[in-house]
A protein has these predicted regions:
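Extracytoplasmic gate region of multi-pass secondary transporters
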Residues: 12-13, 194-249, 256
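Helix-loop-helix hairpin linking two adjacent transmembrane segments in secondary transporters
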Residues: 83, 122-170
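Symmetry-related core transmembrane helices of the 12-TM Major Facilitator Superfamily/SLC fold
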Residues: 149-167, 363-382
């Protein structure tokens, strides 16, 4: 499921290049392909996240998958930029529904907050695999003369298979959900909770920086956008040119590998220290890549994927684990809202800033570097103050029956 979702969402950098040519739109307009998708997820996460708590994980999951499949199949009849954008928005709404249900389900099957974090990294690792497959598949379709919208048709087919599988699987039922069903009002109240808000802001900053890589890195690394033969001619040798062409796929590959490693890592190391170290390395990659330019960024920007790998799954896991299981769908929706808001706002702001300075993507990466600096500062505070230690320990004992003085 996570892999199927990533095939479309993380291929947007490659798709934007095609959309700009096909519909003759600007960077700002083309970035709506990403921004509206994320706005759909954000709206759905905040206002529909409670569905997984109110009606159960299975029903909500199937509803979201069905909406996503329909939106994907409709890409075959889309012929205008406005219609394509409407489908992108609908698919985002669908993702928000099924992803909050899936995230809540992880809490139902976990036996501790530590196991929850490991499982979350595993699920997001498959997202990473989909993020590798998607851009490669788009590139292959285009070279074969097949329209890029077939990526969505393929995703719709996978989604249909997932619906059939979901119908046959028995899901664990949380007793708390039956006794205390959550409403939209309860979900919105979480916006005032410092734990939900803290992890949500962290997710916003992280995703704003991460999406800069897969949305705008292809544009940043291009030498001459006006000539296909000279597009990567500024790089010293053929191997570096090849890396520039496949930089997004390399980034996603490193991120996926890092998340599989993260399953083990989060079982053996203090999560606050791991996130602090990795956020520092992300900031360093952005700063040096921006200052040195594409010649060095072609190595550093993809490399940042290994350091980004465990941050978002851990934010998600620890944020959700700060609450009772009956609220997991709602809090997952709140975090997803800020996640999608960051993914929508980050690249859009970068596109606007780039257009304001003549269309050069490097000016947009100044914004992305700022996000990475704020992320590091937030995780530095988290590592020093440890604001969630007591809350996680309390939930560990109450919800999972594990008595511990600390939660890692």
């Amino acid at each position: 499921m996570f892999m199927m979702f990533a095939m479309t969402s993380d291929s947007v950098g490659e798709i934007i290049k095609e959309v700009k040519i096909e519909f003759a739109v600007t960077n700002t307009q083309a970035s709506l392909m990403h921004s509206l998708f994320m706005i759909g997820i954000a709206f759905s996460g905040l206002f529909l996240g409670f569905l997984a708590d109110k009606f159960g994980r299975k029903k909500t999951l199937i509803l979201g998958l069905a909406l996503f499949a329909i939106s994907c199949y409709l890409f075959m009849v889309g012929s205008t930029f406005a219609f394509i954008l409407s489908l992108v928005t609908l698919s985002g709404l669908a993702v928000g529904v099924f992803k909050t249900a899936a995230l809540a389900l992880i809490g139902d099957i976990s036996r501790s907050t530590k196991e929850h974090t490991g499982t979350m990294n595993g699920a997001e690792a498959f997202f990473g695999v989909g993020a590798i497959i998607g851009p490669i598949l788009v590139a292959w379709l285009i070279t074969q003369g097949v329209h890029w919208t077939w990526l969505y048709v393929i995703a719709g087919g996978l989604c249909t298979v997932l619906i059939c599988m979901a119908l046959m699987v028995e899901y664990p039922q949380s007793k708390a959900i039956k006794e205390k069903p959550t409403s939209l009002v309860d979900s919105l109240k979480l916006l005032k909770d410092p734990y939900a808000l803290g992890f949500s802001i962290g997710a916003f900053l992280y995703v704003a920086a991460e999406s800069a890589i897969y949305v705008w890195m292809p544009s940043y690394l291009i030498c001459d956008a006006n000539s296909a033969s000279d597009m990567y001619s500024c790089y010293a040798n053929e191997s570096t040119q090849t890396l520039a062409i496949y930089a997004v796929s390399v980034f996603f590959a490193l991120r996926a590998v890092g998340r599989f490693v993260g399953i083990w890592m989060m079982q053996h190391y203090e999560w606050t220290k791991v996130l602090l170290l990795f956020s520092f390395m992300i900031m360093l990659c952005f700063l040096v890549g921006l200052i040195a330019g594409p010649m060095l960024a072609v190595f550093l920007f993809p490399l940042s994927g290994i350091f980004m790998s465990v941050i978002y799954p851990t934010f998600n896991s620890k944020g959700i684990s700060c609450f009772e299981k009956r609220q997991h769908g709602s809090v997952a929706g709140v975090i997803l809202f800020f996640t999608a808001a960051g993914a929508a706002a980050g690249p859009f702001i970068m596109g606007v800033v780039s257009d304001a300075y003549g269309g050069d993507a490097k000016y947009g990466f100044v914004v992305a570097t700022g996000f990475s600096i704020l992320l590091f500062l937030g995780l530095l505070y988290n590592a020093i103050v440890q604001p969630t230690r007591e809350r996680l320990a309390m939930i560990e004992k109450r919800e999972y029956g594990v008595d511990s003085t600390t939660a890692s």
